[in-house]
Amino acid sequence: MGWLNLEQKVAIVTGGASGIGRAICEGFAEVGVRVAVADVNGEGARQTADELRDKFGGEHIATTTDVTNKASVDAMAQAVLDAFGRLDILVNNAGINIPRLLVDPAGNEELTEKIWDRVASVNQKGVFLCAQAAARVMIKAGGGVIINMASECGMEGSEGQSVYAGTKAAVYALTRSWAKELGKYKVRVVGIAPGILEATALRSDEYERALAYTRGITVKELRERYKKATIPLRRSGRLSEVADVVCFLASDRSSYIHGTVINVSGGKSRA
């Protein structure tokens, strides 16, 4: 057994077909976890599950899951129970970001009610529905771990992405609240707040252009400023570094970590 003792555990990773989620799936598979790759992109989820089996061996499945739809989330949980008979870990990773300014005097598209509802539905409602479905299974089984994906901007705010920051701030509160509710059932609830990463869905070209625009600088200048001026380690994070923290938090090596959100930001965020 490895140091983490995660062999044969079963984990759901939402948003697992790409970006941080895919890196987490790979990190889990490498240490022997059986992974359910859940994603609204069903083909991407199936491809990821196939690649996990080819690269790491073991049993892995894919589910086409819309985290904003309760029936879809319940079907995801049932598919995992049908395949593995248990659920030990949920990683609430699925999330979206549609950057817009609240008001833009320059005439560019502003934040709209439709955008607000869409981002909040995935980033807040989705976290709630998946956590609820997983918690029901874990309570019956006598324990488990729920890991919620927050963000540094959930504590600090961020120009041009207020709705994203607001939904991620909610993840902090949900993590702490559910920890108080579920601890007595031996279900740990923790969070992770990544900072600036080398390549994720959240750090898209559109995002960088929008953020650079709000600061009146180029995208290249934006990247250099963030690395040199705001990150003490002077570099962006790697997806694998987030996955490593997830694996640790999912293991019994972190058995007394509960109700907190861990920053993975190279020192940029310290709250």
Predicted segment positions?
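Residue(s) in the substrate-gating loop at a strand-loop-helix junction
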Residues: 151
